[in-house]
């Protein structure tokens, strides 16, 4: 048994606590007169209630109404509203402190117990006191209604417990009936007498030797439990006629303040001032578990009315907890779920038939009765299960062949160990905490192998045949238990549970609030955070993760897109997702099948994968609506698809503008018809150069000045002149004047000034533009002599606007018409043979979801380790995709030589094809043009190999040359002549050379490794592939080979330096770390640089290299050494020897001089490998591949048919 704390509050002394029946709320009564309302699920304080004067002691939520009641040392009882968070009214009548208050479960009553030695019952609807129960002769510490019967139990400091019968009170206050005048008078007198006639003492229980602090009824049995200042917990039983003491639980060392029955199990829970919370076995009356706080006395314990939660009030606040885990153990094998039910019986559930079997066996004999199992693992070959207990033990149980009921298992092997799980048909692993190792054991429980584990292990999970995931507090490590070594690791904190995808390619690592998605090799894909606690997860057949929190079922795509599928009324644990069905286990160990709508997440996944036929099918067949889908489509860059879901004009207008669809935007703008919408449409039309649409909008909106400017910029002179007339008709002086500038109409402009009364301006315009007649007329009109007018010394003619050179007005910019997307073509019916049938990807339902078993040959012999000179690790490196080991050679054909080779050259001009056809000169010219090849000697043997490799010969006598028989083609299923090509060695040969290079790198043979990588480059140069994926992979391998050659060449240069050249040695060690090597290989370079710089007191540089090293390897002896170096270097923080290396600057390394080429510095590149050189190296031979000329003009390597 373990206390799992779900929430804690820090405050002054808490005297009372109450759970809301349906919401995750808890009320806390504080000694400081405050009542707090907490959301214990979110850990947030919702409200404070500050109306009591003095300490608050009693609290209770109403079972159905949004109210609660409180009582305290101010002698009052207050009823509060949860809707308004205000006090509704106050009940007065008690003459001393009120200790407890509780609602009746059915009737509108409140019961209160007080230090005035009375128990009072109130009607909270009419706010009247309906009974006052007297009889105790000391403080009444507690009084409660019976859950179902008309009984009350009360506890007092007079050392007694009283059971009261209130059936008469119920009868009197039930539905009104006819009563005589005498009965009414009797009822009033009875109330004045304290209603003792309606509430009578049924039993008085004596046995405690000091005051009794608490008494509680059992929820279903005729039992009472009490706690007293005599430090004892007593159990009482009652019948219809008598009540008696059953037993006493001793163990508390101070006053017992509160005690209750466990609502669901045969347990008693008590708290006391000895700072302990104790759990007792109800059947045996023996202690089960004790939980102690260091400094806080407990004052009250309360149980949630419906779920397995408890709350305890103590000196510094409250704690909400549950006793032990409620997650049922389960394991999926093929189409069956094996699980442990609430009675600790193992059952199976068939997903195909949707039925649960009878129990196979009872597991009650394993472990402690109150401790839940941590996990189970199933072995189908032996039909057995491994059961992990909570106390560091496990049991191997062989199940009956057929479920026959809850029988005791015939074969049970128990031993010490944690996290036992099967990894093969006859092997399982278990963590031995004492030796800190993972032990591989046989079915006879004999240890066959030990794997040392350095850090604390939280759990171990099967990861496929022969592999396990070891979960550490800060990382997850994938181990190959057959070879006894790490395969990969991922830094992720506090992982609790793991879920593998159906195909085993992806894994979800779940902590309390985080899900991390990774590949099967623990390469990080995505990580997401949830506010609500994550409970379980399973992958559906389409590769979408479905997971549950406390109150939701949610989904997540690999790219991090997620959403809510369904709201849960109670916590469920997902075991399998199949189509629209989600199979779950509840906390009672029962199977529940939920129906969900997977349309939303399948729609999003199809959109991410660009599976447009599926997108179209889902749109047509499903009811996909809502802002969620629309905003998702908008965010994902598919506004044209979002338009299909929207009817609202505002949203359609926004989407059309985002998509650039002016036609739809215009239709919606006409519906909306407001100025802001038209303005936005104009801006978009102008941005797209659609002058005709902008013209139409300006006309409808009467924006004449903007329309004039539009005509000006588009060169529409005729319409621009008409705007002058329109302005005159409108008598708009400003518009008239503006149009004269646009039209260069100086005569009209001077006339407008004159008509406006500005004769000086009219005269100046006429004079400046040479209109002497008009100028004289204006002088005459002003009655001014020309000699009296002073003009500026220099005036230019006011032809501001150049006449357009275009002959025809521009209505639309000549834009390139965008191609229709697949989706748009499908909507328009432009896709032939489009089928949108509802086809769910076929999934083999018999495939194991989390099956750790297989037919592997498990070798118990120790596997030898490489004794490489680096001595820095022995991890292998995978390059690119896994390629076939054997090339499928085509059938041998024998046409005439000239015909066959001519067909090859006709079908492809790749260098490899030309070499195979024997056209060596043409091949050399092609290589020279593509990648600048000038040195042919290294390629000679590859020319010969390719030429001879695509031909077959007949063996002859030793003195004769072999006769050629035929040719080997690349494809044996070629049906047309234009697809006939020769066989050329493929990527498998390249991959073999790369792996050979990695091996020599690890063995510290840099010169041999360089030759291997260089040979891989030569192979790629004469390669032939037939798809884009292989082409991309080949170029990637070429870049990788270049980086390894560069890095190893730098290291060889460093080793060749003479002693005393420290600066250059440190520089080369630093430059080696800049080569883009595999992370595990880069650690070699980082360790060399770190050690050398630390040795020569370059502490700043050493700290940087140590930090980079720890990013790759965070545990183990080398990591510990790096951590020490970093700590020491950080404390010194200085460099003794300045070098030309800035770790934070962007630069490349010259492959000839091994010096940095910083950004914006002139450089040249090799056309084949892409390596960088200083400008002085131009026209020299490349140092990486040794066959091409640096800086030569080239078109790029072509290897794809």
Curated annotation (Swiss-Prot):
GO biological process: endoplasmic reticulum to Golgi vesicle-mediated transport; intra-Golgi vesicle-mediated transport; intracellular mRNA localization; intracellular protein transport; retrograde vesicle-mediated transport, Golgi to endoplasmic reticulum
Subunit annotation: Oligomeric complex that consists of at least the alpha, beta, beta', gamma, delta, epsilon and zeta subunits. Interacts with the ESCRT-0 subunit VPS27. Interacts with KEI1 (via C-terminal region).
Biased composition (Acidic residues): 848-862
Residues covered by region (Disordered): 842-862
Signal peptide stretch: none
GO annotation, cellular component aspect: COPI vesicle coat; Golgi membrane
Organismal lineage: Eukaryota, Fungi, Dikarya, Ascomycota, Saccharomycotina
Main location: cytoplasm
Function: The coatomer is a cytosolic protein complex that binds to dilysine motifs and reversibly associates with Golgi non-clathrin-coated vesicles, which further mediate biosynthetic protein transport from the ER, via the Golgi up to the trans Golgi network. Coatomer complex is required for budding from Golgi membranes, and is essential for the retrograde Golgi-to-ER transport of dilysine-tagged proteins.
Repeat positions for WD: 9-39, 51-81, 93-123, 135-165, 207-237, 251-281
PANTHER family attached to this UniProt entry: COATOMER, COATOMER SUBUNIT ALPHA
Compartment annotation: Cytoplasm; Golgi apparatus membrane; Cytoplasmic vesicle, COPI-coated vesicle membrane
InterPro entries named in the record: Beta-prop_COPA/B_2nd (IPR006692), Coatomer_alpha_WD-assoc_reg (IPR047312), Coatomer_asu (IPR016391), Coatomer_asu_C (IPR010714), Coatomer_complex_subunit (IPR050844), G-protein_beta_WD-40_rep (IPR020472), Quino_amine_DH_bsu (IPR011044), TPR_COPA_B (IPR056176)
Species this chain originates from: Saccharomyces cerevisiae (strain ATCC 204508 / S288c)
Pfam families referenced in this protein's UniProt entry, alphabetically: B-prop_COPA_B_2nd, COPI_C, TPR_COPA_B, WD40
A GO MF label: structural molecule activity
Protein name: Coatomer subunit alpha
Keywords: Cytoplasm, Cytoplasmic vesicle, ER-Golgi transport, Golgi apparatus, Membrane, Protein transport, Repeat, Transport, WD repeat
Topology versus the membrane: Peripheral membrane protein
Tagged with keyword Oxidoreductase: no
Domain of life: Eukaryota
Miscellaneous section: Present with 15200 molecules/cell in log phase SD medium.
